[in-house]
Design a protein with these regions (language model features):
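N-terminal glycine-rich flavin-associated loop
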Residues: 63-83, 108-111
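Flexible, small-/acidic-enriched active-site or ligand-binding loops
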Residues: 167-191
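Short, solvent-exposed loop/turn segments at the edges of secondary structure
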Residues: 70, 95, 111-113, 139-143, ...
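A short, Trp-centered hydrophobic/proline-enriched beta-strand micro-motif
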Residues: 94-103
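Short Gly/Pro-enriched turn/cap motifs at secondary-structure boundaries
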Residues: 106-109, 135-137, 174-181
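Flavin-dependent oxidoreductase catalytic core characteristic
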Residues: 1-30, 34-57, 62-63, 86, ...
C-alpha cells in the first residue's frame, strides 16, 4: 500500500505494471479474439468484467490503461482490415497498449464537429493533419485509432491507425496530473495509406458509437472495485476506534451509514454482473444490453459516489490522510460518472427505452447467468447502436416484481406502488412536448426510470443466486429495495417542486412519496453482515 500511494502522489508512470502485462501476456490473452491469438485468447465478457473490478479495486490509474486499450481496440476488431488485425495481435503479444483518438479539445466527443482531417495525397495515399485531446495511453500506444474526416468529403468519416513512435506523431503533454497518461497529440501531416485505414463513412461513425457502447460498461466495475476496497478500509478503521468510551460502530447513525453503504454496494455488484449476462447473449435480435450498459456506466458509478460519501461520513478526517487507499478513492470515484459520456448524456439515452420497458408486453427470452468461457463476437458486429432503441422489447415488467425473491421482501409492495403511480403519470399526465425538451425535468424522470430498470435486474440476480448474490439474499434484497423506495421518493419530491410540473403531475408525484417498510430485525442482521467484514481484508502495508 505504501509503495502504491507513493507512486500515486509522485505521479510515477507505471512501467513496472506494463512489464507485468507483457511478461504475463495479460492484454494479449484477454483482449485478442481467438481467431487472432493463442489457445487462451478470447474476448470473454465475463472474464473481462471480473478483471475490470479487480483493477479498480487496487488502482484506477492502472485500470485506465486497460480501459482505453479496450476503446482503442474496438474500431480495429470491428474493421475488416485483416493486416492491421494481425499486426494488433502481435503488438498485444509484445505487451502493447492501445489508444482511442476520438475526443478533441474544442469539441469534446462531438463527432460531427471533429477537425482532424485525412487529406488525399495521390492514389491510395493521404496525410493526417490535426490534433486530439484527452487520449489515454497516447504516449506509448502501439496503435492509436484515429477518428477523422476526409477533407474533400466532409461528411465521410474515417478511422485509421497511427503509431506513437512515428516522426510525424507528437505527444505534446499529459493533460492531467496523474499516473495515468491522458495525452494531447498532434499529427503533423502524418502519412497514411489504405493499409492503415480501418473504416469509412457510416461504418466509421457506427464503430465509434459501438465501441463506446460496450466499453463504457467497464466504468461501473471500476466503481465497484473502488467502493469495495474503501468499504474494507472504513470498517477496519471504525470498528477499532473508540470515542467517548464507545466503539464508533456502536453509534446508531454510524450503523445506518454502514447499512446503506453496504446495501448500495451489494446492489452495484449484483446489477453489474447480471447486466454482463445480457451483453454475453447480445445479438441483432436481442439488444437489451443497450439499456443495461449505460445503466452500468451511469447508475452504478453514481451509486459508487453514494457509497463513498456514506463511508466518508463514518471515517471523517481519516479519509484525507495520505497513507490510506480511501484518500485516492475520494478523487477517483468522482471521475467515473464523467467519462465515456456524462451522466446527463447516458441518462437521456436510458429515457429512450422507457416506453418499451414499461408498456411493451411482448414476451422475450429469459437470460441465463453464465461464467463459463465464451467469446462475444457480436460486440464487433453491432452495426448502428442508436437506431430503434424505443422498440427494443424487454418483456412485461410486473412479473419481475412477483418473483420468488421479490415476494419475500416487504419493500417490494411499496416499490411497486411507486412504479404504478409513475406509469399512471406517464399515461394520464404524460410529459408535454415542452417538458420533453426540458433536459432538467427529463433528467429527474430518468432518475426514477433508471431505478426501476436497476431494481429489475437486481431482483433477477437474487432469484438466480450464484456468486454475485449474497448469502441471505432475500434479507439483503429487502434492504436494497428500502433504499430504492427512499430514492424514488426524493426524486418525486424534486419533480413536484419543479415549476414546469403541471398540477396533475404534482399530485401524482406526491403520491409516489412512500415510507419504506422498516424492520429493526433486518437492520440488525444487515449490520451483523457489515461487522463480519472487519479485518476480512487489509492491503499489505
Amino acid at each position: 500500500l505504501a509503495e502504491m500511494k507513493r507512486e500515486d502522489h509522485e505521479v510515477v508512470w507505471y512501467e513496472d505494471f506494463l512489464k507485468f502485462l507483457k511478461d504475463e501476456e495479460v492484454f494479449y490473452t484477454f483482449l485478442t479474439p481467438s481467431a487472432y491469438g493463442g489457445p487462451d485468447c478470447r474476448w470473454d465478457t465475463a472474464r473481462n468484467t471480473a478483471f475490470s473490478e479487480l483493477l479498480g479495486f487496487y488502482s484506477l490509474s492502472h485500470w485506465y490503461a486497460w480501459q482505453v486499450s479496450i476503446l482503442g481496440l474496438g474500431p480495429i476488431w470491428i474493421s475488416d482490415n485483416e493486416e492491421i488485425k494481425k499486426s494488433t495481435a502481435a503488438k498485444l503479444k509484445e505487451g502493447g497498449i492501445f489508444a482511442f483518438g476520438l475526443s478533441e479539445k474544442e469539441h469534446g466527443a462531438d463527432l460531427i464537429s471533429s477537425d482532424m482531417e485525412l487529406i488525399p495525397d495521390g492514389e491510395g495515399k493521404y496525410i493526417a493533419r490535426g490534433d486530439k485531446y484527452y487520449i489515454g495511453n497516447g504516449n506509448v500506444a502501439g496503435y492509436v485509432s484515429i477518428f477523422a474526416k476526409l477533407k474533400e468529403k466532409k461528411k465521410e468519416y474515417v478511422f485509421f491507425v497511427v503509431e506513437t513512435n512515428h516522426a510525424k506523431y507528437e505527444c505534446t503533454q499529459n493533460v492531467v496530473r496523474s499516473q495515468k497518461y491522458v495525452a494531447e497529440l498532434v499529427l503533423h501531416d502524418y502519412p497514411i495509406t489504405d493499409r492503415e485505414i480501418l473504416l469509412r463513412g457510416r461504418d466509421a461513425w457506427d464503430a465509434s458509437l459501438a465501441t463506446v457502447a460496450f466499453a463504457k460498461f467497464n466504468l461501473g466495475l471500476a466503481s465497484v472495485g473502488i467502493a469495495t476496497h474503501s468499504f474494507y478500509e472504513a470498517i477496519n478503521h471504525a470498528a477499532a476506534r473508540k470515542l467517548y468510551g464507545s466503539y464508533v460502530t456502536d453509534f446508531p447513525h454510524i450503523k445506518q451509514l454502514f447499512n446503506e453503504a453496504y446495501a448500495r454496494l451489494v446492489a452495484m455488484r449484483m446489477f453489474s454482473y447480471r447486466a454482463k449476462d445480457y451483453m454475453r447473449i447480445a445479438s441483432e435480435s436481442d439488444r437489451r444490453y443497450l439499456l443495461f450498459n449505460p445503466l452500468v456506466k451511469m447508475k452504478v458509478t453514481l451509486e459508487g459516489e453514494q457509497v463513498i460519501e456514506r463511508l466518508w461520513d463514518v471515517i471523517a478526517a481519516r479519509g484525507y490522510e495520505k497513507d490510506v487507499y480511501f484518500e485516492s478513492a475520494t478523487r477517483d470515484i468522482r471521475m467515473l460518472p464523467k467519462l465515456e459520456g456524462t451522466v446527463h448524456v447516458n441518462m437521456m439515452l436510458t429515457v429512450r427505452f422507457m416506453q418499451s420497458f414499461l408498456f411493451d408486453e411482448q414476451a422475450v427470452a429469459d437470460v441465463a447467468a453464465s461464467e463459463s468461457p465464451n467469446e462475444e463476437e457480436f460486440l464487433f458486429n453491432q452495426g448502428a447502436t442508436t437506431k430503434g432503441l424505443d422498440t427494443i422489447p424487454f418483456g412485461p415488467w410486473r412479473p419481475k416484481f412477483k418473483s420468488k425473491a421479490a415476494k419475500s421482501c416487504a419493500n417490494t409492495d411499496v416499490l411497486v406502488q411507486q412504479i404504478e403511480t409513475f406509469v399512471k403519470m406517464l399515461e394520464k399526465a404524460a410529459p408535454s412536448p415542452e417538458q420533453s425538451k426540458d433536459i432538467d425535468w427529463m433528467l429527474s424522470i430518468g432518475e426514477i426510470f433508471s431505478i426501476i430498470a436497476y431494481a429489475s435486474l437486481i431482483i433477477e440476480q437474487a432469484d438466480l443466486g450464484g456468486p454475485y448474490a449474497p448469502a441471505d439474499v432475500n434479507l439483503v434484497l429487502d434492504q436494497i429495495l428500502s433504499v430504492f423506495v427512499r430514492d424514488i421518493s426524493r426524486h418525486a419530491l424534486e419533480l413536484h417542486e419543479k415549476s414546469s410540473s403541471t398540477a396533475e403531475q404534482q399530485k401524482l408525484f406526491l403520491e409516489m412519496i412512500r415510507r419504506p417498510a422498516h424492520n429493526e430485525s433486518r437492520e440488525t442482521k444487515i449490520f451483523e453482515k457489515v461487522m463480519a467484514l472487519k479485518e476480512s481484508y487489509r492491503m499489505a502495508p
